[in-house]
Amino acid sequence: MANLPIIGIYKVLYSYEPQEINPGEEIPENEREISIVEDEIVCLLEKGEDDWYLVKRNVNSNDDDEEIGIVPSNYITEAEPSTKMKALYDYTQQSVDEISFQADQTLDCYGDTDSDWILVGFNNNFGLAPRNYVEGMDASSAPASQEPSASGVNAPTVSAPNSMVSPPPSFQPPSAAAPATSLPSDYNPPPPPPPPPAVEDQAADANEPDDYYSSGRAVSPEIPPTYTPKQADPLPAPPPPPPPTLPPQSTNTSQLPMPSRNVNNLGSQVNIPPPPATPSQPPRPPTNASTRSTGTSSSMAHSYDSPPSPSSPSDAYGDPNQHLKLRTDSHDDSRAYDSSSSMGNPAYEKWEVREVVGKKKKRTGILAINNKSIVLTFTKTMDAAQVWPVTDLVNYSSERKHVFIEFNSDSGITSLHLHASSNTNADNIIRALGDVAGSARAAGLREIAAASGSPMPKLPSDSALHRLNAASDAAGVNGGRTGDYEMSTVYGDRSARAEDHKPKDSSAGQKMGTVLYDFIAEAADELTVKANMRVVIVNDTASSDWWKCSVDGKEGVVPSNFIKPDTEGDAKSPPSSSKSGQGSSLSRRASKHESKHKRDSKHEARPESKHESHRESKSAEKDKKDKKDKKEDSKRSRSHSVSKPDSSKLRTWTDRTGAFKVEAEFLGYSDDKIHLHKTNGVKISVPSAKMSYKDLDYVELMTGKKVYSRTERKKDTQKQSHDHGHSHSKSHDREKEKEKKKDREHRKHRETEEEDEGPPPQPARPESTRPALAPPSSSHSNDKYDVIQERPKISYDWFDFFLRCGVDFTVCNRYTHNFNNEHLDEACIPSLNPDTLRTLGLKEGDIIRVMNHVNELNGVSTKPASAITPETKSTVNQIMSGGEALAAPVAVPAPIPAPVAEPAPPAAPAKEVVEKAPSPPATRPKSTTPQKFDDDAWANKPVTEPPVRASSVTVEPARVTESMNKMNISEEAKKPEAPSRPRTAPIPEPEEQKKAPVEKKDAEKSVQAPIPAQPTGNITIQNAYFTAPQPMAADPFQSPLYVQPTGFQPPPSALPIQPTGYMQPIPVQATGYQPLMVQPTGLQPHMTGVMPQVTGVMPQMTGVVPQMTGVMPQMTGVQVQKTGAMPQQPVNYGYQVAGMQPQATGIISQPTGIRAQATGIMTQPTGLHTQATGMMQPTGMQPQATGIMPQATGMMQPTGMQPQVTGIMPQSMPMQPQMTGVQVQKTGMVAQPMLSQYTGYQQNYTPTAMPAADGYGMQPSMNDTQAYYNMNAQTPVNYGFAGGQDTSFGYEQQQMYSPMQQQQQQYYGTEMQPDMGYQQPMMSNYYDPMQMQQQTPYGYNQTGMEGYSEYGYAQPAGNMANPMSYDPVSNASLYMPSDYNQQTQPANYYDSSFGGAQGANEAGKKASIYQATPDNPFGF
């Protein structure tokens, strides 16, 4: 850095010691700090951009003493010339530190003039000059006897001709110069020249340009960097001037050699006592210098502890009226600049800028700065000029062309975002702001002196600060000082206002705060405050939104977000001086600005304040900009010698797409790349293929080389024009869209700014924040703050309250927290309503629980309707829905009625069970206490229609019970169902079925009746059969047994059950599939697929009883013994649920059923009682199959067939069925429902596809080669399992029925078990016409409907006998042992299987159609 020329002579204002560095750390010379001493003269080599100047000290001393380094720019100021001297000879500089001048030129001399080399300057050129080449301007007045000067020559007079002046001595470098001891012994240095008179000093001050920037010093002509160290060989001396004509005695002295530069240092220091407290140093310049610029400027702007931005040596910019007309409001004296200010109306430095408003909008204007004001005027709008005093400047920074300025105003911090025309202008604006801010804030030093009680030393008369203070005192404007520097008014009226608003009752122990925004009281207990007021915070704990404050003896509440509390240090720090009020004023002013600085830097904004959040976002943006500034500064400060492009060679370069532009200097072209030097000093290389053709033409012009192909350019141009023609409309639309989007964004941004302009929103008034609070006491009725302060703490245990309401304990804590936050207590419980609970975060279910509990506390009844209402309603719904709901168990949400705790007597009829249930109340009891809410949707509503329906339904079970009582059913069947199932008792509408006409039309109308009857009957019968003897099967197999026992019950006790049983068999047929299917799923398919058949069958079933009764006597007479066997069918049916047994056992009884089916004529069954049952066999037959299945499935043993083969076997049979039944019920019943449903479902579709299989599809699907007996086996599969095709009974039974039933029994016992579930696809109809006729009327084919009698089986009686005897199916005795018909079963056989349902047969009762009456339809 030694090769830098001197660009200025500066004087040190304050001593400075450099920061200590690590011994091993290497710091460049341009970043190394040096120590300076007050009043020392230093030479300025370079001005840094970060408020640090590169200087050289002891430049006119020995080389060993020279130091080069950086010092704070605000610690030095431009030196004033100590005197003026005149050049005696021409001199040409020999090194970079020297200066060239011509003879007779007037030079300004700085510092000591007695040394051999002195610092001089002229025309903004500075350097060292030989002392013997110049003379003082007052030499003519010196006496003639004056001794020779230090140069060894007599000082010539001004009028002396040059020819009389002796030639200068030859120049010797300092290293080669002779020591001082080599001077002649008679050499006596002359006394120093007297100081210039005051008049000349003032003239010099007046002649010196005041504008620091406008009078920028011109750098001396650049010298090639060929400077050699001072230790090099001596340079040849310049030719001496012509010798002046002087007396001979003076010629000897004229030949004295030029004095060497190794004379001792500068003259004596001025003994001015140092100031008591020097300003703190600016941020240390680290190696990367990343924190100098922004750190210094921001810290100086906010704190007195660190020096302000670099101060300007002068403050005169000229008369602003000669440069710029400012539109200002005449009444705003504090803002308007004063054109009559000191120092001859200081001028404004101005720049053209654009103010950035919002995202896209900009306003063009002119920024003017002088040492008193900062003015922004707008040239294209009529907006008034914005004027800010320099003392309001808080912060300033720049980022390339963007300048960010912040001012402190009455309304808070005002931010200004300006866009300069170039980076240079932005840098100049920042420098000017630093100068004026430093000049204004230097007054703080006087306040520090006053506060510390130490007198401020007098400034040198030639210092810039002295001139500034003197001018301010003379003008009497803001920024001046009193003559004794007691107090500064640099902060204007705002500091006075802050002092006026100082709380009078404040003390050291009270908490203080600063008001951020104006607040106007709207109530008696509120306090009106202004921004920047200092208030005493009396209480800030009672409420988080409102603080009680005191100011000027008045107390009131103020929004907490309008006050900035002081830190502990601020609150505890006492005023530094109270003698004259100056210290307290300073303390208040410092705390005020410190709080503003903290508020601006930390942005402790409350989230509820939009204004604060906006400021926070601005702060974040500012931090980003600061980081960028630091990065750029670090880059700039790494090396002050970073080369910048020549501004005269800059041009704008554009890429081929036109999207990117850059200002850079062209360096050269090579390797198909264009080398550019950008304005920021970065050098880049851009491929020529990416550069625009216009720039390529420029490169070709500069280099003379061909850079691109003209053909390629032509193609690109054509392509662009072609694309432009197609995309013009699209681009036009896009531009419109962009404009619209910009407009929308602009409007939105303006609205946001308008919202952000005001202070933050005030919190809710204290009385409205907590509606549940108790009213304030009378003594504080007019003080909202006292109400908040005295609010009691909520102690009610809401957690326990919610637990008592039945709320889940996992959410009670959250609800409790919400209630406590709202300060609710037990007094609020009566007024709780669903809306309030919902607002407090309760779930809907919990709201109902809480409201029920609240109603109980309020005396409002919340008991639900009696249990009979939902039961009755569900029963009615089941009846109306065709029994579908009855088939599937339905969970009733209503509570269990009283019979659960007090079960009915065992023999109580179903009617009593129903009557015992309480009837629902007609209306809901009204609350005795007034309710505070109208929403009672959660309360139980009165039920009107269901009770009416229930009353009609409850009558029917009585009738059914009476009819059932008339039947010979065992006591177990009469037992009522368990109290927990009251809905199983009623059997709907049996009388209607009795009275129903036989016509087809009426049968279709009453389709729904049998279906519900069937489930009801099933339930009753099943309870009779399964509940008492086999409790194991009651619960798990309850559903599967409903229909099957009912449907099959008629066959076992055909005579007794037919009144209802036949209604049941028909439902069984219709729903027989349904129950099985319904139980799991099959009810729906069954209803759908078989419904038509059911419809047809139901009337048949109703009418079948008489026919069968008519036939039964014949059958009874003929086959009484078989009637004994007949019960086996029920046994099988009971086990039929298992699905496989019916065939095994069913064969025994089935011969009847089968014969009836095969023959299709009732006559054949007529011979046998079993045949009568067989007539019902369409129903019964399938039950047989079903009944048999249990043996096959349940027994899975060959023995299951033995009962069928031999009459004796029944003895073993009963045991087998029982065992099988148990097995079936446990496993068969569980698995059976699924199999039967599945099977039934498929079987239903089989009849649908085949007209002959309309009924259950069993017989029609039989194979011609299949035995009659096998048909029976299939039937139970169909009936009981709802699909005979799905079992292997029929599959293996395709073989002809052999006389030896052992063979078939094996199929049932062995083969059938593994093959269960397999369909019988090969079966086809094998019936003689007689059998088909019988099937058809029974419901397998609708063609026989017209033959229905009252009970449904309308086959001619004559047809029943004859064919029966010849038909192997009708007359099973042909294939049975002779004693088969005489076989009997044990008395307990049927009871053990199905609960004793066959007790009638054991008693010897016989059914006779001739004795049948309406009350005794079976003719027992």
Swiss-Prot record:
Q: Where is the composition biased (Basic residues)?
A: 589-600
Where is the protein localized? Cell membrane; Endosome membrane; Cytoplasm, Cytoskeleton, Actin patch
Keyword vocabulary terms for this entry: Actin-binding, Cell membrane, Cytoplasm, Cytoskeleton, Endocytosis, Endosome, Membrane, Phosphoprotein, Repeat, SH3 domain
Where in the sequence is Phosphothreonine found? 929
Write out the GO cellular component annotations: actin cortical patch; cell division site; cell tip; cytosol; endosome membrane; nuclear pore; nucleus; plasma membrane
Residues annotated as signal peptide: none
Recorded topology in the membrane: Peripheral membrane protein
Q: For this entry, list what GO says about its biological process.
A: actin cortical patch assembly; endocytosis; regulation of actin filament polymerization
Polar residues bias: start-end ranges: 152-165, 250-271, 287-301
Residue positions, PTM Phosphoserine? 309, 311-312, 454, 573, 577, 927
Q: From start to end residue, where is composition biased (Low complexity)? A: 139-151, 173-185, 572-587
Segments of skewed composition (Pro residues): 187-198, 235-247, 272-286
Quote the biased-composition stretches of kind Basic and acidic residues, using this chain's numbering. Answer: 326-336, 601-636, 709-742, 969-980, 991-1005
Query: For this protein, what is any one GO molecular function term?
Result: actin binding
Per UniProt, residues of the SH3 domain are: 5-81, 82-139, 508-568
Q: Does the keyword Repeat apply?
A: yes
Chief place of localization: membrane
Family stated for the protein in its record:
Belongs to the SLA1 family.
Q: What does this protein do?
A: Component of the PAN1 actin cytoskeleton-regulatory complex required for the internalization of endosomes during actin-coupled endocytosis. The complex links the site of endocytosis to the cell membrane-associated actin cytoskeleton. Mediates uptake of external molecules and vacuolar degradation of plasma membrane proteins. Plays a role in the proper organization of the cell membrane-associated actin cytoskeleton and promotes its destabilization.
How is this protein organized at the quaternary level? Answer: Component of the PAN1 actin cytoskeleton-regulatory complex.
In Swiss-Prot or TrEMBL terms, this protein is called: Actin cytoskeleton-regulatory complex protein sla1
